[in-house]
Regions:
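Periplasmic N-terminal accessory/gating domains of Gram-negative outer-membrane beta-barrel systems
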Residues: 25-41, 55-172, 179-182, 186, ...
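Hydrophobic, lipid-facing positions within transmembrane beta-strands of outer-membrane proteins
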Residues: 108, 181, 236-242, 306-310, ...
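Transmembrane beta-barrel strands of outer-membrane/channel proteins
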Residues: 196-204, 256-260, 324-330, 369-375, ...
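Solvent-exposed loop/turn elements at secondary-structure boundaries
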Residues: 409, 422-429, 445-447, 467, ...
Length: 622
């Protein structure tokens, strides 16, 4: 199997100043690039987002939100993705952000220019915080292989963010690991002040008015197994916490914050059937089926998210700044499968990040280096450790022996098993941005850097997990009734499986400007020892400021972006290497001596290649 994705698009990149930025501000963004980080709103009439390139020209398409922008924006749950709802390049998931899932508190899945959500790169202070442990499965809990993680490894409170930048095309070579875009969040540093803020908020369904189509049945008991909390017509959410910053000395200070989000979602558990396999001498297999009705009712699903952040910043000299940041993000979900008896489960996600960074300004330019350790854990525990599925076929026979009627009923009970997976990453990154150099009338500016990471992943199953399938065939005729029961068992063996892989990237860019014409050429070279690919990603962008005031700029670019290697594939062989099937009933208490056969579904992993997107952008006539 080869995972390649190629995208060729034509876009209008030449236009007047964006509708949300005045021409005067667009011009100032070009004339005063050194002040780009201190963006002010374009007017007092409403919230404004000013799109600026950090180098002072429109070579890169991105949206930049300052702390002031973030403070003004209403958010549903305080997540970073809540800040991006007005970005035209960002599309939100219908499932994660719909009106019928208002009890959820996790960040919504987003797509940038149509790419899958897990092929965006989420960075915190320049360090990638993506969870690569099967993020594509995070909307479904029915997988027996993994609990399902989320592409965002940290659910950071936006109150602790100093700025957010979304890069969607013509992205600099310093960024990699995406085919969609980059969401770059910079955390707050000590501003030289001392203050503390305490906050709290609450909302619930009784304070809202949800409009639904009367022709649709959207009760919580109508959700299917793959989306057990699909319809949340009743919910209650709370958020509370504090943020503060204090100076320890004249040039050393800290920022500390804690946020807790809670959600209660009363959901209907429909009446079900507990399916048990018991000894039965009347059956040729020696086993039979016992069905026990289980009453339904309303049960409360719960979600809890904790976020802690602490950052110490030392302004050692006017030219040197050092910081040490600790971020913790925890999430817990308690739920059940609506139509399955005894199916209660708990999902846990924990993320821990420790980042040390130093930024040094010198005559030649700015050197920015960081070293980080990140650990993310996903864990699932089930009330019942195994799963039983009963499918009963009733076949009516006429006098001639032909089938006259056929019907089928099904019942399932049990859980999805206990699982735990861990991703640990050590990352080192450095970048040098040189000061511009004039050669005659031509301005030259160089930047270069390196990005190294080492990843260790573990997958743990504490005990054997069994999935029992029972098929009953009941044939009815005028001569009587005959039935046959067959059993099928799938077993996932207990064990701990590990995988390691390393990645390295080198990147460099050259910016050349002549008057109002600018060309930026870049190259990013990447290697990882899982796919053993050497990926060369060229980046090229050129822009022409037609009138020299930033109001009308034509931009043309051709770029290649290589995506993420999902850790699931590195673990896949180990995970399913212990999966076996047998056409019989078997358990730890009643093991089958013979008849097991392997059920591998991981062929072709050695042929995997790194996914990539290739984008060409050309202007249309003005």
């Amino acid at each position: 199997m080869v995972l390649h994705r190629t995208l060729i698009a034509a876009a209008v990149l030449a236009a007047t100043a964006p509708a949300w930025a005045s021409t005067e501000e667009a011009a100032r963004a070009v004339e005063e690039p050194a002040q780009a980080d201190a963006a002010e709103p374009a007017s007092d009439e409403g919230e404004s987002v000013v799109v600026r390139d950090r180098a002072g020209e429109s070579l890169t398409s991105f949206t930049h939100l300052t702390r002031e922008d973030i403070a003004r924006r209403p958010t549903e749950d305080g997540n970073i993705t809540d800040l991006l709802k007005s970005n035209p390049a960002v599309q939100f998931s219908n499932h994660g952000d719909g009106s019928l899932q208002m009890g959820e508190i996790k960040p919504s899945n987003i797509s940038i220019h149509g790419s899958v959500a897990y092929q965006n790169n989420y960075t915190l202070d320049g360090i990638s915080t993506n969870s690569d442990l099967d993020p594509a499965e995070q909307t479904s809990v029915t997988t027996t292989r993994l609990g399902g993680s989320d592409e965002q490894g940290f659910y950071v409170d936006s109150r602790l963010i100093d700025s957010v930048t979304v890069y969607d095309h013509n992205i600099p070579a310093s960024f990699g690991g995406f085919t969609g875009g980059v969401i770059d969040a910079q955390t707050r540093s000590w501003s030289g002040e001392n203050h503390i803020s305490v906050f709290g908020r609450m909302t619930k369904s009784g304070w809202s008015r949800i409009h639904t189509d009367s022709a649709l049945d959207v009760g919580s008991g109508d959700a299917d197994v793959s989306k057990p909390a699909q319809f949340q017509t009743d919910f209650e959410k709370k958020t509370y916490g504090f943020t503060g910053e204090w100076g320890i000395t004249d040039n050393l200070g800290v920022v500390v914050g804690y946020t807790r989000r809670e959600s209660k979602i009363p959901t209907i558990q429909v009446p079900g059937t507990r399916v048990s396999i018991v000894p039965d001498d009347q059956n040729w297999t020696g086993w039979g089926v016992l069905e026990t009705p289980v009453a339904g009712g309303t049960q409360t699903q719960r979600r809890t998210a904790d976020n802690f952040f602490a950052k110490a910043t030392l302004y050692a000299t006017p030219w040197t700044e050092a910081s040490l940041a600790l971020t913790y993000s925890g999430y817990e979900s308690k739920g059940f499968l609506t139509t399955v008896a005894d199916s209660g489960y708990e999902d846990h996600h924990d993320g821990l990040n420790l980042t040390a960074s130093v930024k040094h300004r010198m005559k030649a330019g700015v050197l920015d280096s960081s070293l980080a350790y990140t650990r993310m854990t996903d864990k699932r525990t089930s009330d019942v450790k195994n799963w039983t599925q009963l499918d009963r076929y009733t076949i009516g026979m006429d006098d001639t022996g032909s089938t006259s009627t056929t019907s089928m009923t099904s019942a399932a009970s049990g859980g999805l098993g206990d699982l735990e997976s861990t991703q640990s990453v050590i990352n080192a990154k450095t970048r040098m941005d040189c000061e511009p150099v004039m050669v005659g009338s031509v301005s030259h500016q160089f930047s270069a850097g390196a990005d190294l990471s080492s990843t260790h992943a573990e997958y743990r199953r504490g005990s054997n997990y069994y999935r029992w399938g029972v098929t009953q065939s009941v044939m009815q005729s005028d001569y009587g009734e005959f039935s046959q029961t067959d059993f099928y068992t799938t077993r996932w063996k207990a064990g701990t499986y590990e995988a390691d892989y390393n990645q390295a990237a080198l990147f460099g860019e050259h910016r050349m400007g002549v008057g109002d014409f600018v060309i930026r050429t870049g190259l990013r070279a990447e290697y990882d020892d899982f796919t053993k690919d050497v990926n060369i990603a060229p980046r090229f962008t050129t822009s022409w400021d037609l009138f020299g005031n930033g109001g009308s700029v034509i931009t043309v670019g051709a770029n290649r972006y290589y995506g993420r290697n999902i850790l699931t594939y590195a673990l896949y062989k180990a995970q399913n290497g212990g999966m076996e099937n047998i056409y019989d009933y078997a358990s730890d208490d009643s093991p089958a001596a013979d008849g097991w056969f392997a059920a591998n579904d991981f062929d072709g992993l050695e042929r995997l290649k790194t996914p990539f997107s290739q984008i060409r952008q050309e202007p249309s006539p003005l």
